[in-house]
Design a protein with these regions (language model features):
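Conserved, mostly hydrophobic/aromatic
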Residues: 180, 197, 233, 261, ...
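Radical SAM enzyme [4Fe-4S]-AdoMet core and its adjacent flexible, acidic
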Residues: 12, 206-223, 227, 273-274, ...
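Short, hinge-like loop/turn segments at secondary-structure boundaries
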Residues: 95-96, 117-120, 213-215, 249-250, ...
Length: 442
């Protein structure tokens, strides 16, 4: 009987793509993939180690399955991903119940590692070089069947002072364009209609191997693939958003008019301490240009409150900036000191309660903005991809071009006719909720 393997993948879409490649390798080698990890022989926890809350979630999940192992319900527990890469020695010491701690560079060895564990019952620790970049082979898509993420690069070279990603995943390494297009074509052939392009910094794509950003050319090539209806790009850095990129997004029908652009702050001093560029004036000018070049664009951003040294005045400026710009989508996080980063050693740390309260204030303001934008959407007609049927609410739900999977809101809608999952329908907006919309199929 084939060994049953379950995967629990935590964290960001980039981590999810890694998990899908591992699942494919396991399936190809004869392992049985099970959706309920608690019913497996071997559990892989693909961890996130980005901020404190993510690390705690990963540890809690590992301990949960180690308990099942002690009860005899599963045979082995393996940790992969960012936390395993970052805290390899600590995890081996503090969680001896783990059968393997597998670094990011060794994901391709996962089948051999499982065989070794089951044969010898000896703990395994495996780490490959973080300079390697291999995403060959297929994937087992773990998202809803009609959309998938495609990772166009690994690592990061921006070296923001608050971020540990470069030390975990190495320097930025772009994939060859032909490899990305080949994988995208495979996804389209397997029923994916919405492609979501991801990397730590998508706008840097190609600089390391082609000598310049090739994101516009890559997006153009992806638009030529039959089968995709929507193509969405996440994680664009403001200083690398060029006129060429904006022109491509405006021109290509398959490219949704949606731009995810994490700015983190608007104060020049804070941004400089973060090792980021720009200030309120340059960001305002960029956003004005984006909205002029791409009418009806949906702008998403993320902010950090309580970064070391942030004064009340600088925070108030950030609040005013949010009110002025009126981002369509916004997420805000209280600064989390990360071990080994320069910002962790800054002396002027803001108290946790102040960091968290400032994040709450930003999100309260965004709620007002969201309410206003939703009210303006009343009586409009939008194209919606049906994601499923909400049996509790007795209606369908889906997303529009303005809503990225997993992070943005939903559109709930009634229909006299049966609507299939993955079907794209026209919906008239009749009512609003905090971040969601309610409508009826036309």
């Amino acid at each position: 009987m084939a060994t049953r393997v379950g995967m629990v993948s935590l964290g960001c879409p980039k981590n999810q793509v890694d998990a899908e490649h591992m699942l494919y390798d396991l399936h190809k080698e004869g392992f049985q993939i099970v959706s309920d990890a608690a019913l497996s022989d071997v559990v892989i926890i693909n961890t996130c180690g980005f901020i404190e809350s993510a690390k705690q979630e990963a540890i809690d999940t590992i301990l949960e399955f180690c308990t099942l192992k002690q009860e005899g319900r599963i045979k082995a527990v393996i940790a992969t991903g960012c936390l395993a890469e970052r805290y390899r020695d600590e995890m081996k010491k503090e969680i001896p119940e783990l059968d393997a701690v597998v670094g990011i560079g060794s994901n391709g060895k996962i089948c051999d590692i499982i065989r070794e564990i089951l044969l010898d019952k000896q703990a395994v620790c495996s780490y490959g070089a973080k300079t390697e970049l291999s995403m060959e082979g297929g994937r087992i898509i773990s998202t809803e069947p009609f959309y998938a993420y495609i990772k166009i690069a690994e690592g990061c070279s921006n070296n923001c002072t608050y971020c540990a990603i470069p030390s975990i995943r190495g320097k930025y390494r772009s994939r060859r364009m032909e490899d990305v297009v080949k994988e995208a074509r495979w996804l389209a052939e397997n029923g994916v209609t919405e492609l979501v392009v991801v990397a730590q910094d998508t706008t840097r794509y190609g600089e390391d191997i082609y000598g310049k950003s090739m994101l516009p050319e890559l997006l153009t090539a992806l638009c030529e693939i039959d089968g995709f209806k929507w193509i969405r790009t996440l994680y664009c850095y403001p200083e690398r958003i060029t006129d060429e990129l904006l022109d491509v997004i405006a021109k290509e029908d398959k490219l949704v008019k949606y731009l995810d652009m994490p700015i983190q702050h608007c104060d020049k001093t804070i941004l400089k301490r973060m090792n980021r560029r720009g200030d309120r004036e340059t960001l305002t000018a960029l956003i004005k240009k984006i909205r002029e070049k791409i009418p009806n664009v949906t702008l998403r951003t993320t902010l950090i409150t309580g970064f070391p040294g942030e004064t009340k005045e600088q925070f108030e400026e950030l609040c005013e900036f949010v009110k002025e710009i009126r981002f369509e989508r916004l997420g805000c996080f209280a600064y989390s000191p990360e071990e080994g980063t320069p910002a962790e050693k800054f002396e002027d740390q803001v108290p946790l309660k102040d960091r968290e309260r400032r994040a709450e204030i930003i999100m309260e303001e965004q709620m007002i903005i969201s309410d206003s934008l939703n009210e303006a959407a009343l009586d409009s007609e939008v194209e919606v991809v049906c994601v499923g049927l909400d049996r509790y609410a007795e209606c369908y739900y889906g997303r529009s071009q303005a809503d990225a999977p997993e992070i943005d809101g939903k559109i709930f809608f009634l229909s006299e006719d049966k609507v299939r999952v993955v079907e794209y329908v026209k919906v008239k907006i009749d009512d609003t909720m905090d971040y969601d919309l309610i409508g009826s199929k036309m």
